[in-house]
Amino acid sequence: MWRGLGLALALCLLLTGGTESQGQSSYCKQPPPWSIKDQDPMLNSYGSVTVVALLQASUYLCILQASRLEDLRVKLEKEGYSNISYVVVNHQGISSRLKYVHLKNKVSEHIPVYQQEENQPDVWTLLNGNKDDFLIYDRCGRLVYHLGLPYSFLTFTYVEDSIKTVYCEDKCGNCSLKALEDEDVCKNVFLATKEKTAEASQRHHHPHPHSHPHPHPHPHPHPHPHPHHGHQLHENAHLSESPKPDTPDTPENPPPSGLHHHHHRHKGPQRQGHSDNCDTPVGSESLQPSLPQKKLURKRCINQLLUQFPKDSESALSSCCCHCRHLVFEKTGSAITUQCTEKLPSLCSUQGLLAEENVIESUQURLPPAAUQAAGQQLNPTEASTKUSUKNKAKMUKUPSN
């Protein structure tokens, strides 16, 4: 069960790709020493699984994240995952420092919220982190996962499942600080999962009497990989030695260490990640959406941007338009961004849900719709501009007129 969990995490990482070289990766390494005032949070939590959340008190989404983190702590504790330390580090900026108390009030006394001083080395920078990142360390203080948006949203289960993986698996090798009580928790979870799997298998293969001479086939359920991380996440994950889906004969050997991705959230507008396009262009097998992508695509997009290509753009002849999607999740008021990984001629900048939030989005190109192809229309390039015009609540990729 846990090996499958690690595989699900690893597959998502492979989809997003890393930007940091293997030599620079901090995977399975202790972080640089950092402290706030006279407190050393990593030292204080040594011996327990440690979850460090980088939240910004001036950000509405971060306030929601803090509240959900408290809910997650309670949930995991009820399930027996009690040996976990949670640490929240507020942003160093003046606006965040002024709202520190508001952030602190969103969690209980079990989750300390640390406020950086203005003149101290920035902890976020030391950890190569950004807003809404989650860093998960094992009991020996070694970094196992670094999750960034969108996978650090606590409305997903990626953070939760990553914590459980670190709790029960020795991703970075043996740690002598693992307690017997923790071993018992993991064994109980494994046995419970095994029993549920066996029961589901029995129900699936149990023949049902039919009056028809030809019984109806039962649809096969599609497995949902538990957590993954990905996209702009400084993630340091070890690939599971489990075989990949649809390749049952793959030998169970761990991959080379070069596949331990450390995903960087880029400082500038050039960002990589999953495309949220579920309507894959014809003849483009490489763009077939994965399970994690399909999961993201279930959410409705409410914003669409139409891009203008420069005249010398190679994509202009093969694309009817280029659009960016800004996903908004129900009941959360929070937004995430999906992009494609291919090289594109332009970037789009849109206003976020809040006035101070700017969302940088990569354009995703499509082949012309059937109507465009039938009419033999091509993209009518405008002046060498890379700006995008926002079309709120646009549903379709529109064909430009000549």
From Swiss-Prot:
Principal subcellular localization: secreted
Annotated Gene Ontology cellular component terms: extracellular region
Positions with biased composition (Basic residues): 203-231, 259-269
Segments of this protein annotated with the region 13 X 2 AA tandem repeats of H-[PHS]: 204-229
Tissue specificity as recorded in UniProt: Brain and kidney. Most prominently expressed in the cerebellar cortex, hippocampus and olfactory bulb.
Protein keywords: Glycoprotein, Phosphoprotein, Repeat, Secreted, Selenium, Selenocysteine, Signal
Skewed-composition ranges (Basic and acidic residues): 232-247
Known glycosylation sites: 83, 174
Cell compartment(s), UniProt: Secreted
GO BP: selenium compound metabolic process
Signal sequence interval, chain numbering: 1-19
Phosphoserine PTM sites in chain numbering: 284
InterPro entries noted in UniProt: Selenoprotein-P_N (IPR007671), SelP_C (IPR007672), SeP (IPR037941)
Top-level taxon of the source organism: Eukaryota
PTM notes: Phosphorylation sites are present in the extracellular medium.
Region annotation (Disordered) ranges: 196-291, 367-402
Record text about domains: The C-terminus is not required for endocytic uptake in the proximal tubule epithelium.
Chain's role: Constitutes a major selenium pool in the brain and may play an important role in developing and/or modulating the morphology of neurons and/or glial cells.
PANTHER family, A to Z: SELENOPROTEIN P
Family, similarity comment: Belongs to the selenoprotein P family.
Record protein name field: Selenoprotein P
Source organism (scientific name): Bos taurus
